[in-house]
């Protein structure tokens, strides 16, 4: 019985080892209660496998480690599939919105790298995007910027998806542009 449990634990560890997590922000927040102020921590965590899957999670707990753990679990529940090109870029320009934040992304030539700041850079790197230009517009709130980036990445479509929706072949789609 104990041997079976060990195997299950090893399998879970192997499955989780492909995921990377990065903490974008840790904030100490307070709630006013009858006896005074109750302090807790809020962590914004980005989870990704650098192969086209990424998620943003928020966790709150009385200690930092618990908040990060909850944030990772929340991020894994909100995973987004990102279509990547051969040069590890995005297929087309995109604008994403989250709250008052607006993130503008454009594909870049191979060797350009990730030109973005703050939470946007973290989300793109953990999604596996290697060549992209991105700009944060509007809010500088890390959570809203991360969510806006996730919205933009979720809205990306490949050429084959667009051709399928229009009911034409991919070659005809290229000829039209």
UniProtKB/Swiss-Prot annotation:
It comes from Acaryochloris marina (strain MBIC 11017). The N-terminal domain interacts with the head of the 30S subunit; the C-terminal domain interacts with the body and contacts protein S4. The interaction surface between S4 and S5 is involved in control of translational fidelity. Pfam families: Ribosomal_S5, Ribosomal_S5_C. This is Small ribosomal subunit protein uS5. Residues 19-82 form the S5 DRBM domain. GO terms for molecular function: rRNA binding; structural constituent of ribosome. Belongs to the universal ribosomal protein uS5 family. Part of the 30S ribosomal subunit. Contacts proteins S4 and S8. InterPro entries: Ribosomal_Su5_D2-typ_SF, Ribosomal_uS5, Ribosomal_uS5_bac-type, Ribosomal_uS5_C, Ribosomal_uS5_N, Ribosomal_uS5_N_CS, Ribsml_uS5_D2-typ_fold_subgr. One of its GO terms (biological process) is translation. NCBIfam families: rpsE_bact. With S4 and S12 plays an important role in translational accuracy. Located at the back of the 30S subunit body where it stabilizes the conformation of the head with respect to the body. One of its GO terms (cellular component) is small ribosomal subunit. The keyword Hydrolase does not apply. SUPFAM superfamilies: dsRNA-binding domain-like, Ribosomal protein S5 domain 2-like. Keywords: Ribonucleoprotein, Ribosomal protein, RNA-binding, rRNA-binding. The gene is rpsE.
